[in-house]
Amino acid sequence: IIVTEPSLWGIHDMQRVVELANHFNVPALVCVNKFDLNPNLTADIETFAREEGLTCLGRIPFDPAFTEAMVQGQTIFESNSNSRAGPAIKHIWQRLSFQLAL
């Protein structure tokens, strides 16, 4: 799973990982973290993924609750059951499970 963020560095790093995965013939999936910080670059990431034949599992919104959870040494689900990111992560997990036939 390639988790990227909508920034120039995020796109660059994602492209490098995709190139590496292609070189070694390793399947890859994409997930966009903090997608709502830059909708235009998020669209560019998703377009690139489609052009490369990659599945985009989903988008995770920016959520300050993540930092709070890390400080507490907990998952986002343990720390804040009403977080904005929680439903997105569950959706991505469901799609990943389907992709891997779990």
Descriptions of predicted regions:
Residues 1-8:
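Inter-motif core of Ras-like GTPase G domains
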Residues 9-13:
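Short glycine/serine/threonine-rich phosphate/pyrophosphate-binding segments
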Residues 15-18:
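Histidine-anchored nucleotide/phosphate-binding helix
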Residues 20-102:
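C-terminal lobe/tail of nucleotide-utilizing enzymes
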